[in-house]
């Protein structure tokens, strides 16, 4: 008679949110149109924009960052980035509805905003909405295919959604992009998932 041995299942940690750490450049240029005034440049001396100030406060853990991100949005300063980072603040405060609203407003402003798709996927996975998490992880991979955490988290989400074969494939994609130390963790997960298929 065969004996079934249960292996202890370790819940792998998901990677956290990915805040926007720099101001993205926006181009007002029209395709095929030459700029006649390339030499002129407005230089602000020792003055940060509202978004840059919010980012600085946020990195220091200052609660004023939330208000400064809102100010940046009102001023039209890095709107998608500000909404994204505001979504992280709301998510960390467990205001999931507000966080989802912030991330989707960021995507309304910039539909291919990588960090918003990735963070929205993390949030959906955290609250247990795996089908929506899957969609946003897949979108973040389409936008930035070399970001390893998207592949790892997609693998975890697929495993939670009982899509084991696809989870293994996603973890193998993560493994290709991971450091040597991170590969060991991925190998353990792949091995565990493979055993669930073969038994």
For the regions a protein language model found, what residue spans apply to each?
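Structural marker of alpha-solenoid helical repeat scaffolds
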Residues: 75, 109, 143, 177-178
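Structural signature of tandem alpha-helical TPR/SEL1-like repeats
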Residues: 58-71, 92-105, 126-139, 161-173, ...
């Amino acid at each position: 008679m065969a004996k079934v041995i249960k292996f202890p299942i370790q819940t792998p940690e998901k990677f956290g949110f990915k805040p926007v750490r720099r101001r993205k450049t926006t181009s007002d240029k029209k395709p095929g149109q030459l700029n006649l005034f390339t030499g002129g440049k407005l230089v602000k001396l020792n003055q940060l924009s509202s978004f840059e100030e919010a980012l600085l406060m946020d990195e220091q853990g200052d609660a004023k960052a939330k208000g400064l991100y809102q100010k940046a949005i009102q001023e039209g300063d890095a709107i998608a980035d500000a909404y994204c980072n505001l979504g992280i603040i709301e998510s960390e405060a467990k205001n999931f509805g507000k966080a989802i609203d912030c991330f989707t407003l960021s995507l309304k402003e910039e539909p291919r905003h990588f960090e918003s798709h990735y963070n929205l996927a993390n949030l959906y996975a955290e609250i247990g909405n795996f089908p929506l998490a899957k969609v946003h992880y897949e979108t973040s991979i389409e936008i930035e295919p070399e970001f390893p955490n998207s592949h790892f988290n997609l693998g975890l989400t697929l495993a939670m959604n009982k899509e084991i074969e696809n989870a293994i494939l996603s973890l193998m994609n993560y493994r290709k992009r991971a450091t040597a130390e991170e590969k060991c963790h991925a190998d353990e997960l792949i091995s565990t998932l493979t055993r669930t298929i073969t038994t």
